[in-house]
Regions:
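N-terminal helix-rich structural modules
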Residues: 26-202, 626
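Active-site-proximal, well-structured secondary-structure segments within enzyme catalytic domains
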Residues: 138, 142-143, 171-174, 181, ...
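Short pre-active-site segment immediately N-terminal to the catalytic Zn-binding motif
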Residues: 451-467
């Protein structure tokens, strides 16, 4: 999913809204038709389009018109025009990948990057936007976001400092790549060969088949630090010796990344200082919903403290189980996953294979749409539309009898589709410079087991949760009602709350009354038993407090590390200090977790890892507001739609939440959701 935060940032994105157009017989179409006329010529056509847009931007910049309507309205229309051309390619390259789509996509990206850089360096446009004000709150939010985007790109810096910032950005990118490459090299360099069958006796056949190989004509089992292989042995590996060996290798990967971290931290601090922030954590919050570094730290510490007591109980139960079953008296970190899985099986006797026959894809999809319809008083009608694969399903959305949006579902795996699941926004609800209203559309993409002529697509419960999650992103965009494109739908929504609506909707996928709507055996049509339904929720909350404490540890380390400049051994000392309140087992000295923390050193989560739990508190609190003893609380659900979904990025999420419920979200709601007693 792509997230737009400002005019400057949106030109970088690969997903944009699409303008309305006429079809071949001159009849107005409500939605863009999915097609690409000529893949081979696409990059050349894009080059011409971008040149035309830059000429238009130059004309806007040089004009005497300094009104919002004369400057920012047409600039947002250009975003639509660009998306009108580019979205079909970016989407097609992900869902029907081929040499032709990849070639066109790769040739297009440098053009978009250059285009974005040109806009970022347009000092005259920046000065013009700074003079604009509006009495319309949505329009003023667009203005504020755009000014912020220019400032954070260094538009107000003197020339020499601007060059320094550009050099820092380039070096940061190089260091992030180095961190990733070092980690990849270290991951690929390790192999653990097991020759004795008894040491792999408990590993599921599907995992064992991946590990099985031959050396000198003898069958052996090779495990690596690739996540599926690593987790397979840590979770099911019988031998403590081998669990320790692979755990030590994983925790001590890429020691050369320690120097990379020092360089990254130094440059991030320099970048923050150049842009007049005290720290990189403070810089990070400039585009987020959290208001201060103190607020984030207090939130994390409160969450950790409230989960601590139950986490200790969960660990003691685990240690007692290991002692009872295998006589383990010196319980270690490399024992946790193995005994957690064994205890889970003893307590619940449950796995996904028991529920999969009850989750037929078509019934799950229809059931989910019914839930959304009932919650938000909308209607989904299946329609015929041009699509990229015959298994894609398309629905138009109606609100109070009026057409309000369109959603495409591409749910089954195929070799041409990249892995994972995502929501890709397409058209956006807004009013253009000519006063015409545009309707939103979006793609929901998953990789569920394919259906055949004889057998339907059956989902694991995790798949059901994934579908609800991505639909939560979808309705955040599709239910947007703002007139200003840059803050409508998911556009302009802060990074630390973008997962709020998705996590909100996925919560319903664990509720027995919801699952009963569509959990029927695909052959006998028998409903899923109450026993199985209860186990789905019970296993979700298994060792939840330990999980929360672990996430708090990661988040506190990330955020505090970016509060000031830490170098060398100071980094490990900070992590050790945080672990005094979050790590319930001693951590061996060889553990250098930070050297593999790619989320913050090679990804987009630097000083932002807290976002996962920040958004989850909102989603849990909203969930409990929207249900009551009779099922859905329609009044609260209507308010959620009005204040949270309809208003998109037009106001800070904390303000919208206050307007909806008249209070701040409660951390206790998240703890309640995970069955953690306070």
């Amino acid at each position: 999913m792509e997230i737009s935060c400002s005019l400057l940032e949106i030109f970088l994105l690969s997903s944009f809204g699409i303008i309305h157009r006429t079809n071949n017989i001159g009849q107005k179409m409500q939605f863009q038709e999915f097609k690409i006329d000529n893949l081979e010529e696409f990059p050349k056509d894009l080059e011409q389009l971008l040149a035309n847009q830059l000429e238009t931007i130059d004309n806007i910049t040089k004009s005497n018109d300094e009104s919002y309507e004369g400057v920012l309205k047409p600039l947002q229309d250009l975003e639509e025009e660009l998306g009108n051309f580019f979205t079909p390619l970016s989407h097609l390259n992900s869902v029907e990948n081929s040499e032709a789509t990849q070639k066109a996509y790769e040739e297009s990206l440098p053009q978009l990057s250059k285009y974005s850089s040109t806009i970022a360096q347009n000092k005259a446009l920046f000065e013009k936007i700074k003079k604009i004000t509006s009495s319309n709150a949505q329009a003023q939010k667009v203005i504020d976001n755009d000014i912020r985007g220019f400032v954070l790109a260094g538009a107000e810096l003197p020339l020499e400092q601007k060059k320094e910032l550009e050099a820092i950005e380039m070096k940061l990118s190089e260091l992030g790549n180095s961190f990733s490459q070092n980690l990849l090299n270290a991951t690929n360099a390790f192999e653990m060969i097991i020759t004795d069958e008894k040491d792999v006796a408990e590993i599921p056949e599907s995992d064992l088949a991946q590990a099985r190989t031959e050396i000198d004509g003898k069958t052996v089992y090779k495990f690596t630090l690739q996540i599926p292989s690593y987790l397979a042995y840590m979770t099911y590996g019988t031998s403590r010796h081998y669990r320790k060996e692979i755990a030590k290798a994983y925790a001590s990967r890429a020691p050369e990344n320690a120097k990379v971290i020092d360089e990254l931290m130094e440059l991030r601090q320099k970048k923050a200082t150049l842009l007049d922030f005290k720290s990189f954590s403070e810089y990070s919050l400039a585009t987020k919903d959290a208001h201060s570094t103190e607020e984030v730290t207090s939130f994390l510490e409160e969450l950790g403290n409230k989960a601590l007591s139950q986490a200790k109980d969960e660990l003691e139960e685990l240690k007692a189980f290991a002692l009872r079953t295998d006589g383990i008296e010196d319980f270690k970190g490399f024992d946790v996953a193995y005994y957690s899985e064994k205890l889970k099986k003893e307590k619940f006797d449950f796995d996904d294979s028991m529920t999969k026959p009850y989750f037929e894809q078509a019934k799950v999809l229809r059931g989910m749409l019914d839930v959304v319809s009932e919650l938000f008083a909308v209607e989904f009608k299946a329609v015929e539309a041009m699509v990229w694969n015959e298994k894609v399903k398309t629905f138009d959305i109606y609100k109070a009898g009026e057409l309000a949006g369109r959603v495409y579902f591409d749910l089954e795996a195929r070799k041409e589709k990249r892995g994972g699941a995502w929501m890709h926004d397409w058209e956006t609800h807004f009013v253009d410079a000519n006063g015409e209203k545009h309707l939103p559309s979006a793609f929901i993409v998953c990789n569920f087991s394919p259906s055949t002529d004889k057998n339907p697509s059956l989902l694991r419960h995790d798949d059901v949760v994934t579908l609800f999650h991505e639909m939560g992103h979808g309705i955040h965009h599709l239910f947007g009602k703002c007139d200003e494109r840059s803050v409508s739908g998911i556009n302009g929504v802060a990074w630390d709350v973008i997962e709020f609506p998705s996590q909100f909707l996925e919560t319903f996928a664990y509720e027995k009354p919801i699952l009963k709507r569509f959990a029927f055996h695909h052959e006998s049509n028998e409903p899923m038993s109450d026993e199985l339904l209860d186990k789905i929720k019970d296993t979700k909350n298994y060792q939840a407090a330990l999980g929360i404490l672990r996430q708090v540890e990661f988040s506190l380390f990330d955020f505090n590390l970016h509060k000031k400049l830490y170098q060398g051994e100071e980094v490990q000392a900070l992590l050790n200090e945080i672990r005094e309140t979050t790590a319930l087992l001693p951590v061996p000295e060889y553990n250098k977790f930070q050297n593999g923390f790619a989320h913050i050193f090679a990804g987009g989560y630097s000083a932002g890892y807290y976002s996962y739990k920040w958004a989850e508190v909102l989603s849990a609190d909203a969930f409990y507001a929207c249900i009551d003893e009779n099922g859905f609380n329609q009044e609260k659900a209507e308010g959620y739609q009005k204040y949270i979904l309809n208003r998109g990025g037009s106001e800070d999420m904390s303000e919208l939440y206050q307007q909806w419920l008249g209070r701040e979200p409660k951390v206790e709601s998240l703890l309640k959701l995970y069955g953690i007693e306070v």
